């Protein structure tokens, strides 16, 4: 199933919130991404429909196995890119 780039960003942010706080709340995702709460509400509805997350009666979000796989892939990709860019800048500083 094809997932939108914006949805990948939301899932990655949700994983980061889970790792940082131990739980995922919509308000934390909104603050982390710099978006409005209604934007997060819209995204979570889409992610629930696609089976990437569940939400309990208190509004706490849980990544499903599928959602966790996408989120972990995105987080790993960003960590790899960050490490690469830091290595490139570090090499240029030495050469410069």
Which ranges hold each PLM region?
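Amphipathic alpha-helical dimerization/coiled-coil segments
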Residues: 79-96
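Generic detection of well-ordered alpha-helical segments
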Residues: 8, 72, 76-83
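Basic, amphipathic "hinge/linker" alpha-helix immediately C-terminal to the N-terminal HTH DNA-binding motif
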Residues: 59-77
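N-terminal helix-turn-helix DNA-binding core of bacterial DNA-binding proteins
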Residues: 2-35
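Canonical helix-turn-helix DNA-binding module
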Residues: 26-57, 65
């Amino acid at each position: 199933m094809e997932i939108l780039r914006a949805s990948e960003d939301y899932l990655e942010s949700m994983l980061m919130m889970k790792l940082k706080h131990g739980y995922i709340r919509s308000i934390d995702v909104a603050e982390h991404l710099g978006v409005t709460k209604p934007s997060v509400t819209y995204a979570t509805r889409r992610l629930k429909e696609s089976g990437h997350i569940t939400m309990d009666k208190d509004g706490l979000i849980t990544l499903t196995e599928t959602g966790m796989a996408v989120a972990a892939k995105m987080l790993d990709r960003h960590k790899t890119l960050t490490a690469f860019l830091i290595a490139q800048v570090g090499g240029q500083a030495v050469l410069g």
